[in-house]
Amino acid sequence: YGDCLSKIMSFAGYDVTREYYINDAGNQMYNLGVSIKERYKERCGLECELPENGYHGKEIIQLAESLYDTYGDSKLGEDIPFFKEAGLDILLEGIKKDSDKFRVNFDVFTSEQSLYDRGFVENTLNKLKNSGKCYISDDALWLRTTDLYDEKDRVLIKSDGNYTYLLPDIAYHSDKLNRGFDRLIDVLGSDHHGYINRLRSSLEMVGYDSSKLEIKILQMVRLLRNGEEVKLSKRTGKTITLNELIEDVGVNAARYFFASKSLDTQMDFDLDLAVKNSNENPIYYIEYANARISSILRGKEIPKDIKFSTIESDSAYTILNKLLEFEDVIISAASKGLPHLVANYLFELAGLFHSYYSVEKIVTDDEIYTKERIALINAVKVVINNAAYMLGLILREEM
């Protein structure tokens, strides 16, 4: 979603920075370090005692294996921070590698820990305390976010002295606004619905315009195989990684299927449909349209200054009208944050071309007739490929 939206916005003329926020601080990172160390001990032939709140997935075993390959058993005496940092480095390298494979590019990687190291979190805490909106209850420090948009007040510092996620998140968004961005778009998972109003309220309490922040909530994805849901659980180790999905269905299918659904729609990803070589599969249908046009245009000169004097059929006029819609679709998708508008437009345009191709000859002995239709289908190809670019698709020229 985020990569498609950034490409659409760039195409529409926005100056876009793609940023990845690394959650490398807090208890979950400590649990990661513990989990890796236990798996490393296991790899070294010692007893493994994974904590209940640790990570049980196969990727932790792979991380431990990687560390063993590098160090042997020489790191058995290291404390949790070593395994946390080593694991983070390997995971981040994998994220970058998988993102690149998925054609997702980031301009900036920002570390949560760096916000602590640079004093941003403490500065933010002091600003909030000075705002008069903080109070102590049950030995915890609370922020009175109900004074603005939130349904309940939020804890900043827990009774055990640990910071909640909210505090560094306020610092992070403050930092982005300090860098001069006019519009911030967060792309978050479906468990973050309550996050929107608490963050907006918090930003206003430290002096920022919260209307500059937009939070896009992605829905959970159900993977289907043979018509049945593939059950997944990160904690129990039953997962399908992005890399495995790409290997299974290909980058084009994965990207198109994800982009084609609106944010408020449950995403059912049919793994069988995604690899079908038939018109039932939308990415196949789109690629087939592009390949058909490419085959017709191959070796032909693209005419200019065409008047379309011989264009008379309803199917041709329908295509022309659809092409005229393209600019409005891009503007709407960019301004409203709706990449699925481009995905749906692309599918519809491909369908109109297939219909046109089935009822009207394109190449005939009539030179003017042929030139006008060559110009028409070339325009279709240009728009198909522009839309495909914005969705991160690389379409085949032959099938």
List the model feature ranges, each with a label:
Residues 1-399:
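Non-catalytic interaction-recognition regions
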